[in-house]
UniProtKB/Swiss-Prot annotation:
It catalyses: 4-amino-4-deoxychorismate = 4-aminobenzoate + pyruvate + H(+); D-alanine + 2-oxoglutarate = D-glutamate + pyruvate. Pyridoxal 5'-phosphate binds at residues 50, 153, 216-217, 253. Pfam families: Aminotran_4. Belongs to the class-IV pyridoxal-phosphate-dependent aminotransferase family. 2-oxoglutarate binds at residues 252, 254-255. GO terms for molecular function: 4-amino-4-deoxychorismate lyase activity; pyridoxal phosphate binding; transaminase activity. Keywords: Aminotransferase, Cell shape, Folate biosynthesis, Lyase, Peptidoglycan synthesis, Pyridoxal phosphate, Transferase. It comes from the Bacteria. The record marks 26 as: Important for dual ACDL/DAAT activities. This is Bifunctional aminodeoxychorismate lyase / D-amino acid transaminase. Bifunctional enzyme that catalyzes two enzymatic reactions in biochemically unrelated pathways: acts as an aminodeoxychorismate (ADC) lyase (ADCL) in folate biosynthesis, converting 4-amino-4-deoxychorismate (ADC) to 4-aminobenzoate (PABA), and as a D-amino acid transaminase (DAAT) in peptidoglycan (PG) biosynthesis. DAAT activity is strictly restricted to D-alanine and D-glutamate. May function as a metabolic toggle that alternates between ADCL and DAAT activity, prioritizing the former over the latter in response to substrate accumulation. One of its GO terms (cellular component) is plasma membrane. The modification N6-(pyridoxal phosphate)lysine is found at residue 149.
């Protein structure tokens, strides 16, 4: 199902994009993906803020947020009326037609992929791969727009296919100078011993000034976890820190929390906080309600 910013509902099979839309021919646009759970879209404002930031980095017109909110509401209501299942709600915003036009903007909802359900339940195996950027690449090379969520996902998809050929289900990118960055569709979060020893572990993720996308789910997770007494921080991490941690998760708005059970072919010990971590993420995803 597709909803335009005018509130028009398009059924599957109805034409939407022109053949020369820059979303299709260049990947020239931005997007967001939200989870629909328990009758509502999750973390809507956080995703709209990131959509706005991505549009700004891409020199796209400022998104009309009231119209986006209304389209999200209409799409969510229609989805919830038709099924009790979770939904994957996407916000698509492209530069428009190649010959010049207003931007293309719409919301679409589809079923949550089976892959996502499996990753939540069983975790994933992952491999580390060089991203080809230093940890300071975002500042040194701003034209790479590493902190924008763009439609240009060819590299992300290619790296996941490469991982599959190696027998892995996901990837953790590492900078050329050896620092952990992110997954191709997720934020890396690890649990370590707290600074005081004993008690709750500390949750860590790479610094947001790295050439990575800031995670909406990770930020909500840190807010919820801090309120429950967990230390949460942004820290430079090496691959060795992943192996030394109490647990590694790939966190995202759709998969939520995929525990990494195998890294670079090495089976990791079962983390004692696996269930608690999943509960924290479940609470975080609805923390704006």
């Amino acid at each position: 199902m597709v909803v335009t910013l005018d509130g028009e509902i398009l059924q599957p099979g109805m034409p939407l994009l022109h053949a020369d839309d820059l979303a299709a021919v260049r990947g020239d646009g931005v997007f967001e993906t939200l989870l629909v759970r328990d009758g509502r879209a999750c973390l809507v404002e956080a995703h709209l803020q990131r959509l706005t930031q991505s549009a700004r980095l891409m020199d796209l017109p400022e998104p009309d947020l009231p119209r986006w909110r209304r389209a999200v509401e209409v799409a969510t209501q229609r989805w919830v009326a038709s099924t009790a299942d979770e939904g994957a709600l996407r916000l698509i915003y492209s530069r428009g037609r190649e010959g010049g036009s207003a931007p293309t903007a719409y919301v679409m909802v589809s079923p949550v992929p089976a892959r996502v359900i499996g990753a939540r339940r069983d975790g994933v195996s992952a491999i580390t791969l060089d991203r080809g950027l230093p940890a300071d690449g975002g500042d040194a090379m701003p034209w790479l727009i590493a902190s924008a969520k763009t439609l240009s996902y060819a590299v992300n998809m290619a790296v996941l296919r490469h991982a599959a050929r190696q027998g892995a289900g996901d990837v953790i990118f590492v900078s050329t100078d050896g620092y952990v960055l992110e997954g191709p569709r997720s934020t890396v979060v690890i649990a370590t011993d707290g600074d005081q020893g004993g008690g709750n572990p500390c949750l860590l993720t790479p610094p947001p000034w790295y050439p990575i996308l800031r995670g909406t789910t990770q930020q909500a997770l840190f807010e919820v976890a801090r309120a429950k007494g967990y230390d949460c921080d942004y820290r430079a991490l090496r691959v060795a820190d992943l192996f030394d941690s109490q647990g590694i998760w790939l966190v995202s708005s759709m998969t939520l929390a995929a525990r990494v059970h195998t890294l670079d072919g090495r089976r990791l010990p079962r983390t004692p906080i696996a269930e608690v971590f999943a509960e924290l993420v479940d609470a975080a995803i609805v923390s704006d309600r």
